[in-house]
């Protein structure tokens, strides 16, 4: 039936029978087409046709299942057109509607519904909404903690004290996360108990024989391979340089030492040899003819190796068996208590679901698993009778996207497939044993393998959903390509999507950086993509572009001054990268007549001009970057749409409606009430709101309105309101003087609000929300605004959410608001309603995850200089599905806390797995492109970074694994791979990197590396803004030419106020302003002092900036304000306090990076820290205002005119504390210090006003004044 010309490998994937077949399908290999064709061939086989309902086809998404069903239906219909009388085709078309083409969850639900009688669940069960589940979980954990507190459960109390900090919400988060994590295991309770028992070591415990020791050794060997390369590179330099041959012997000894370590299989021997080794000293010979540059180079490389080996020595030296054993024994009770706590929580949560006849998403797989499995007398997990019936029913089980399977799904599929073997636990891990099992009934005819699995481990990017790529990898390594094998694999690496230029570039890059260590697979020539698509000769392909910009590129003061741009404004990195991308898109699209890129249109069968819809911008995450890019592209006139999962709850229409619901539930909330009052729903002006607030500033705003309402209506105030009225006559006068229109407006709103509150009790929440839309007219109003269609779509989503909520077990407005809040915080917001059609001519911005399975003519991958997200590694307890728990060691009695050995091992393992995931995500991103691929990124300090890249180029075939392991961004991988490519020569020359590379790679891939100039982008933007303003001014003045008022207008615009200088004197100054005034150059005249105010864009309109020096200072000051010195005995204590500020949302994780625990600890342990600890009266961040004569600051002013002029000096004193003989004033500074005297002079006037303020406020003497300088970890005394 198919007219497709299949490759030999594709034919094998379609027609191979009677085996378990793993199809390894690279990007663009046409795996879906192959899978569909295999199904068609099965159902139309002339010798052994199989009805389509006898196949189980498992897809990753519902959309994929629908597409597959549609493709099969189209193929059958096409066959019927050719042979209308075919009974087989007609039968298959009829059976298609009841075919088993579905997601794994749909199949599990089918199993549950067909076999509910075997379970203790109601046949009318409902799947609970995710947010409903979150609400139930919170109820369950609150109740559980209350019960355990009440009975004073000792294990629980110890857990709280060790891992909950001040609030038990921290421990609740640990329990909820561990519960979710455990549910990815087939048998969660067993997994939880096994992981805790891993800490239950006996007296004969020998760390050197454990899995942990082997892991440490293997991780260190990766580093040793890097050291080996460095030493080998050094030896090559020694042998090829003049006059340094005497270095050869010690370097050779070092290399032999490294080689010996790499051969060790025993941790004991490995550890012993590293600890015992002493590097031989280099000979101190002088040779006039010696190549000094080469000599210095090899010494540097050796020093680097020595330093790293010393670090490894120190680590291994701490791995003393008795110490580790004590650590395990100490942690065991806590970890056992944690496992039991999670099990108790799960039972309570399960009970709540059963009360409501609910199951959640995790239950679907686990209930199905319990139906399909049994245990035999040996305790092995084998198929149940129901599973054996499914084995009889399904002639073949086909699994799409197999690389994204988790262990629960793998066990389920093994139960319904005809596989020989059983599952059992070994060392706490569930493993499959491929052996014959004894069943009560012989399975005649069911011994022929029938499993078909298709996927690509290089595209496994769902580890965060507990996908386990190792399942695919195990079969990939075990299965054979030879025919007539029971377990066979076929590789499909011919790519039918992309141009040769894209494929060659992808192959080059991943051969360089992907390995078993990072990526979990060696990207060899065998794994490489092969060109399968033909684009003809009419249009030549273009090289892959890498566009780089230096974050640290200095813009001179002259340029900043010339363009009137603040340095921070100039260096907004995300904005500038967005601007760069906009310029690239403009160039690509051209003017749609000529000059733009031509792309091949598959539907037209010919080339056409590139359109905006052909372009996608991919990002690792879109939440912070996409809005900035949207704005930058829009400024350039480029239509753009960002597919994000954020922003919905920040839209004006949703904030207003949620505020309305909040005050209907409880009107005593000022912020939501004022939001509604200022909205078109109530239309109060700011002046009217001020008048209302004048009633009483100490009560809620609603209570003020209620008092006005009652007194205006001549209603008697009850005792509650009377309590707040000190002078009823005064209140009556305020109300009497109040505008009559305002009083009526207040009464109308109060009466409406009371009616709405009453109505909310009697109707369902979805009905009530629609009633409010109509009653207030807000839905229609939103539609009349700009982007009205989008706004109304957002309001409809809120209505749909309410409808969804109405079906849950929770009722009432209060619970709905709670539901929305949980939705907001648990799901990380939502994207706005999607009203854009697929064919809209816009550039799309989306995350790499959302692009999986899609393809685009042009792909721009942006944000490659952004750091990988490793925040999960900072938690006090880590979890790993194979290695178990990685807790901090916390001894509350001795007040000791540090990462345990097992935590460090698990932390490193998770880090490597995260890096492997990021490697695969990068692969997915680059393989979305059909014709053109552009990569953009920002770099910190271009010269230094490129030099680092050059130092990693010793191996032309591979970037060293240790370098890939230490990568923090995609550019950390891409850069070292490309810097040695032949196409990077001109780039290196541009940066004046003239040192000769011995390992330039002459690869067939084509690259174009561009260095973008921040200054030029900034200059372009400022010039564009100036032209726009200039044009508007010209247009206005042109219109004035014909006006009779021209002369008068010019006269008024030219008016100069007589006391212009006085108008420039502020009524208030901060201490910092005073400091700046006093350090002005002495030659500066008064006219310069009073230079005109420059109107600039308000800060709230500015885009998000990088952390500036001033913001850095603010963050450190904020931390010092909240620092508890009594709980700052170690760096870990300080990290804990930093994490608390992050949790309380005082600072973000990114901002926390500027706080150095080491520096804070030095302050705490220093003299000033100790003095603060000993003081009984410590005050932080004390604001003050004092009045002083203006002439004290502005000495140049006319003394007669300004003699009575006063200024208010305002400031905040960082810290002062009291000792027996007076006050001590302390101010923190984060400036970089070159000259102590300069610093003292700079801040002397500031400290003077702080001292004066303290004297006036406290009436006490300030005996000492200090500046603490964090840059040098020391203080200076101000006289």
Swiss-Prot record:
Record CDD domains: DEXQc_UvrD
GO CC terms of this entry: cytosol; DNA helicase complex
Keywords: ATP-binding, DNA damage, DNA repair, DNA-binding, Exonuclease, Helicase, Hydrolase, Isomerase, Nuclease, Nucleotide-binding
Record SUPFAM superfamilies: P-loop containing nucleoside triphosphate hydrolases, Restriction endonuclease-like
Pfam family, one: UvrD-helicase
Stretches assigned to the UvrD-like helicase ATP-binding domain: 4-499
E.C. number: 3.1.-.-, 5.6.2.4
Residues holding ATP: 25-32
Alphabetical list of InterPro entries matching this protein: AddA, DNA_helicase_UvrD-like_C, DNA_helicase_UvrD/REP, P-loop_NTPase, PDDEXK-like_dom_sf, PDDEXK_AddAB-type, Restrct_endonuc-II-like, UvrD-like_ATP-bd
Record carries keyword Ribonucleoprotein: no
GO molecular function: 3'-5' DNA helicase activity; 3'-5' exonuclease activity; ATP binding; ATP hydrolysis activity; double-stranded DNA binding
GO BP annotations, alphabetical order: double-strand break repair via homologous recombination
Cofactor dependency: Mg(2+)
Residue ranges of domain UvrD-like helicase C-terminal in the record: 526-853
Known catalytic reactions: Couples ATP hydrolysis with the unwinding of duplex DNA by translocating in the 3'-5' direction; ATP + H2O = ADP + phosphate + H(+)
Protein role: The heterodimer acts as both an ATP-dependent DNA helicase and an ATP-dependent, dual-direction single-stranded exonuclease. Recognizes the chi site generating a DNA molecule suitable for the initiation of homologous recombination. The AddA nuclease domain is required for chi fragment generation; this subunit has the helicase and 3' -> 5' nuclease activities.
Family to which the UniProt record says this protein belongs: Belongs to the helicase family. AddA subfamily.
Assembly: Heterodimer of AddA and AddB/RexB.
The protein, known as: ATP-dependent helicase/nuclease subunit A
């Amino acid at each position: 039936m198919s007219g497709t010309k299949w490759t030999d490998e594709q034919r094998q994937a379609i027609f191979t029978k009677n085996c378990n077949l793993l199809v390894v399908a690279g990007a663009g290999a046409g795996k879906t087409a192959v899978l569909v064709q295999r199904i068609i061939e099965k159902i139309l086989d002339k010798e052994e046709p199989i009805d389509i309902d006898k196949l189980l086809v498992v897809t990753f998404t519902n959309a994929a299942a629908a597409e597959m069903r549609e493709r099969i239906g189209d193929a059958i219909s096409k066959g019927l057109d050719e042979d209308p009388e075919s009974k087989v085709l007609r039968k298959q078309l009829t059976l298609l509607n009841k075919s088993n083409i579905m997601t794994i969850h749909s199949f599990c639900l089918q199993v549950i519904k067909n076999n509910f009688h075997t379970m203790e669940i109601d046949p009318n069960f409902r799947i609970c909404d995710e947010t409903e589940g979150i609400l139930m979980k919170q109820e369950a954990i609150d109740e559980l903690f209350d019960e355990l507190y009440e009975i004073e459960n000792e294990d629980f109390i110890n857990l709280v004290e060790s891992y909950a900090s001040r609030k038990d919400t921290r421990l609740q988060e640990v329990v909820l996360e561990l519960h979710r994590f455990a549910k990815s295991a087939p048998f969660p309770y067993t997994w939880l108990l096994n992981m805790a028992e891993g800490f239950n070591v006996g007296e004969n415990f020998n760390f050197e024989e454990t899995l942990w020791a082997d892991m440490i050794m293997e991780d260190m060997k990766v580093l040793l391979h890097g050291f080996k390369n460095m030493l080998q590179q050094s030896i090559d330099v020694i042998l090829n340089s003049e006059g340094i041959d005497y270095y050869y012997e010690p370097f050779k000894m070092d290399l032999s030492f490294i080689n010996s370590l790499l051969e060790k299989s025993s941790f004991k021997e490995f550890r012993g040899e590293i600890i015992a080794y002493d590097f031989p000293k280099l000979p101190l010979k002088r040779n006039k003819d010696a190549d000094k540059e080469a000599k210095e180079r090899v010494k540097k490389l050796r020093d680097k190796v020595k330093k790293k080996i010393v670090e490894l020595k120190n680590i291994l030296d701490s791995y003393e068996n008795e110490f580790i054993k004590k650590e395990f024994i100490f942690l065991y009770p806590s970890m056992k208590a944690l496992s039991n706590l999670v099990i108790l929580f799960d039972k309570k949560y399960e009970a709540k679901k059963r009360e409501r006849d609910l199951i959640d998403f995790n239950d679907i797989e686990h209930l199905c698993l319990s139906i399909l499995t049994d245990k035999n007398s040996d305790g092995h997990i084998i198929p149940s009778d129901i599973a054996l019936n499914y084995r009889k029913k399904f002639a073949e089980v086909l699994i799409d996207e197999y690389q994204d399977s988790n262990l629960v799904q793998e066990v389920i599929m093994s139960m319904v497939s005809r596989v020989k073997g059983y599952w059992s636990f070994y060392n706490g891990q569930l493993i499959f044993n491929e052996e014959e099992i004894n069943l009560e009934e012989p399975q005649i005819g069911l011994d022929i393998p029938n499993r078909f699995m298709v996927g690509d481990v290089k595209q496994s990017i769902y580890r965060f959903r507990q996908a386990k790529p190792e399942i695919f990898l195990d079969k990939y390594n075990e299965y054979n390509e030879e025919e007539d094998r029971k377990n066979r694999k076929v590789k499909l690496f011919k790519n039918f999507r992309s141009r040769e230029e894209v494929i060659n570039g992808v192959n080059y890059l991943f051969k360089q950086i992907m390995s078993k260590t990072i990526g979990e697979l060696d990207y060899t020539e065998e794994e490489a993509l092969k060109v399968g698509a033909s684009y003809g000769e009419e249009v030549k392909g273009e090289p892959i572009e890498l566009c780089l910009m230096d974050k640290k590129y200095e813009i001179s003061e002259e340029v900043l001054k010339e363009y009137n741009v603040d340095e921070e404004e100039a260096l907004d990195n995300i904005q500038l990268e967005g601007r760069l991308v906009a310029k690239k898109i403009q160039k690509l699209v051209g003017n749609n007549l000529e000059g733009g890129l031509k792309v091949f249109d598959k539907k037209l069968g010919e080339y056409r001009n590139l359109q905006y819809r052909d372009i996608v911008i991919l990002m690792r995450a879109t939440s912070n970057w996409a809005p900035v890019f949207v704005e930058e592209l829009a400024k350039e006139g480029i239509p753009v749409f960002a597919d994000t999962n954020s922003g919905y709850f920040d839209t004006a229409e949703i904030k207003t409606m949620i505020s309305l619901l909040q005050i209907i539930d409880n009107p005593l909330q000022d912020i939501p009430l004022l939001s509604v009052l200022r909205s078109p729903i109530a239309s109060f002006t700011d002046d009217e709101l001020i008048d209302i607030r004048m009633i009483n500033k100490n009560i809620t705003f609603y209570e003020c309105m209620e008092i006005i309402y009652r007194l205006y209506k001549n209603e008697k105030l009850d005792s509650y309101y009377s309590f707040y009225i000190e002078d009823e006559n005064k209140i009556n006068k305020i109300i009497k003087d109040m505008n009559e229109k305002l009083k009526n407006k207040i009464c109308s709103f109060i009466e409406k609000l009371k009616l709405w509150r009453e109505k909310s009790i009697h109707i369902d929440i979805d009905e009530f929300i629609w009633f409010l839309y109509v009653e207030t007219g807000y839905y229609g109003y939103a539609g009349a605004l700009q982007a009205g269609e989008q706004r109304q779509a957002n309001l409809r989503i809120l209505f749909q959410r309410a409808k969804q909520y109405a079906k849950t077990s929770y009722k009432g407005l209060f619970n709905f608001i709670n539901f929305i809040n949980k939705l907001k915080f648990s799901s990380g917001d939502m994207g706005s309603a999607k009203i854009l059609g697929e064919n809209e001519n816009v550039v799309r911005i989306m995350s790499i995850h959302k692009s999986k399975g899609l393809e685009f003519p042009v792909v721009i991958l942006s944000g490659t200089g952004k750091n990988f997200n490793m925040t999960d590694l900072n938690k006090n307890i880590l979890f790993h599905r194979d290695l178990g728990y990685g807790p901090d060691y916390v001894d509350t009695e001795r007040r000791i806390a540090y990462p345990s050995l097992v935590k460090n091992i698990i932390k490193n393992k998770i880090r490597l797995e995260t890096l492997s995931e990021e490697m695969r995500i990068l692969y997915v991103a680059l393989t979305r492109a059909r014709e053109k691929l552009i990569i953009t990124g920002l770099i910190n300090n271009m010269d230094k970074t490129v030099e680092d890249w050059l130092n990693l180029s010793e191996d032309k075939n591979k970037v060293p694994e240790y370098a890939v392991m230490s990568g923090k961004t995609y550019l950390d991988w891409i850069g070292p791979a490309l810097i040695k490519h032949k196409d990077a020569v001109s780039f290196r020359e541009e940066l004046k990197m003239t040192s000769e590379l011995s390992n330039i790679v002459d690869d067939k891939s084509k690259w174009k590396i561009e260095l973008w100039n921040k200054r030029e982008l900034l200059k372009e933007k400022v010039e564009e803004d100036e032209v726009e303003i200039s044009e508007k001014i010209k247009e206005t003045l042109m219109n004035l030419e014909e006006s009779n008022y021209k002369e008068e207008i010019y006269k008024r615009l030219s008016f100069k106020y007589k006391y212009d200088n006085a108008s420039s004197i502020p009524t208030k100054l901060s201490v910092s302003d005073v400091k700046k005034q006093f350090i002005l150059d002495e030659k500066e005249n008064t006219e310069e002092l009073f230079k005109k105010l420059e109107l600039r864009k308000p800060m709230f309109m500015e885009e998000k900036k990088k952390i500036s020096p001033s913001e850095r200072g603010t963050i450190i000051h904020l931390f010092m304000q909240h620092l508890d010195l009594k709980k700052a005995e170690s760096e870990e204590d300080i990290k804990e306090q930093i994490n608390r500020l992050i949790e309380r949302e005082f600072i973000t994780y990114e901002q926390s990076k500027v706080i150095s625990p080491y520096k804070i600890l030095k302050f705490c342990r220093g003299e000033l820290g100790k003095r603060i600890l000993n003081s009984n009266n410590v005050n932080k961040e004390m604001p003050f205002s004092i009045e002083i004569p203006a002439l004290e600051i502005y000495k140049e002013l006319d003394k007669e005119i300004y003699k009575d002029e006063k200024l208010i000096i305002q400031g905040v004193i960082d810290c002062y504390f009291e000792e027996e003989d007076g006050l001590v004033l302390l101010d923190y500074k984060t400036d970089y210090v070159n000259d102590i005297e300069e610093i003292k002079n700079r801040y002397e006037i500031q400290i003077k006003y702080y001292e004066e303020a303290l004297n006036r406020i406290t009436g006490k003497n300030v005996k000492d004044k200090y500046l603490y300088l964090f840059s040098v970890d020391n203080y200076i005394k101000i006289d």
